[in-house]
Amino acid sequence: MSARIIDGKTIAQTIRSEVAEKVKQRIKIGKRAPGLAVILVGDNPASQIYVASKRKACDEVGFISRSYDLPDTTSEADLLNLIDTLNEDNTIDGILVQLPLPAGIDNVKVLERIHPDKDVDGFHPYNIGRLCQRAPKLRPCTPRGIVTLLERCNIPMNGLNAVIIGASNIVGRPMSLELLLAGCTTTVTHRFTKDLRFHVEHADLVVVAVGKPNFIPGEWIKPGAIVIDVGINRLENGKVVGDVDFAQASQRAGWISPVPGGVGPMTVATLIQNTLQACEEYHDPDIGNN
């Protein structure tokens, strides 16, 4: 059996096109374009690439994108002051602080300083709490993007035995909340989990986000299972691979997301969706600020 490929690149482009059309309609009736502020502290090469892709996506859909490239000597106080200024800026609907931040800056304090209605990454405790209470507002980008992938492929999630490998704040933990909301029976595994293979072999849906190349052998995958590979790992030969042995897993799975071209493009597309949502639901003049 050969798995069907979950084409995140194509689905993400469709979402971008949908958002671009909505922006055109907003402008046509006299409303402003959504605004996104992207803050990069330091010169981490990987972060620079991620930020560039987000800015490009903003331009593509017609958003107003504002860039703040700060030196790695920036103090925590200066960064917090910038966020305060952007929180008060009525032309900015979303504030994104690219992680990781340099040593000496408290990630939690910075993320909590962003107003929840401008938290388009979905990391603020308020937004995570809303998701936990089954009343989501702005949702974490990668987990929401994964759910969108499954929905756009018409893959029903209700009743699935789902296993998440990795318990990070960015993917694993919010992913568990998204899958609970979708009706899955959800297990989160982590570095203390015993007999990981057992959990994977019994999973109808596997979401892997550990950042280790080919960490999950393809032979562990249950025949017909859905495999979502969040990992992006560059090997010494320059090849980019995921956390799952794709060659083997694709011969057993029913559906599988490739790396690259699977989850990655959806994270950026969801950021764009969240920014439009923040603009339309929380910041339009006829709505008023919360």
Curated annotation (Swiss-Prot):
Keyword flag Transmembrane helix: no
Keywords, ordered alphabetically: Amino-acid biosynthesis, Histidine biosynthesis, Hydrolase, Methionine biosynthesis, Multifunctional enzyme, NADP, One-carbon metabolism, Oxidoreductase, Purine biosynthesis
Involved pathway(s): One-carbon metabolism; tetrahydrofolate interconversion
E.C. numbers: 1.5.1.5, 3.5.4.9
Listed InterPro entries: Aminoacid_DH-like_N_sf (IPR046346), NAD(P)-bd_dom_sf (IPR036291), THF_DH/CycHdrlase (IPR000672), THF_DH/CycHdrlase_cat_dom (IPR020630), THF_DH/CycHdrlase_CS (IPR020867), THF_DH/CycHdrlase_NAD-bd_dom (IPR020631)
Catalytic activity: (6R)-5,10-methylene-5,6,7,8-tetrahydrofolate + NADP(+) = (6R)-5,10-methenyltetrahydrofolate + NADPH; (6R)-5,10-methenyltetrahydrofolate + H2O = (6R)-10-formyltetrahydrofolate + H(+)
Keyword Nucleotidyltransferase: no
A Gene Ontology biological process term: tetrahydrofolate interconversion
Gene3D superfamilies noted in UniProt: Leucine Dehydrogenase, chain A, domain 1, NAD(P)-binding Rossmann-like Domain
Recorded GO MF terms: methenyltetrahydrofolate cyclohydrolase activity; methylenetetrahydrofolate dehydrogenase (NADP+) activity
Domain of life: Bacteria
Matches recorded under NCBIfam families: PRK10792.1 (NF008058), PRK14186.1 (NF010783)
Family: Belongs to the tetrahydrofolate dehydrogenase/cyclohydrolase family.
Subunit structure: Homodimer.
Record PANTHER family: C-1-TETRAHYDROFOLATE SYNTHASE, CYTOPLASMIC (PTHR48099:SF5), C-1-TETRAHYDROFOLATE SYNTHASE, CYTOPLASMIC-RELATED (PTHR48099)
Function: Catalyzes the oxidation of 5,10-methylenetetrahydrofolate to 5,10-methenyltetrahydrofolate and then the hydrolysis of 5,10-methenyltetrahydrofolate to 10-formyltetrahydrofolate.
Descriptive protein name: Bifunctional protein FolD
Organism (species): Proteus mirabilis (strain HI4320)
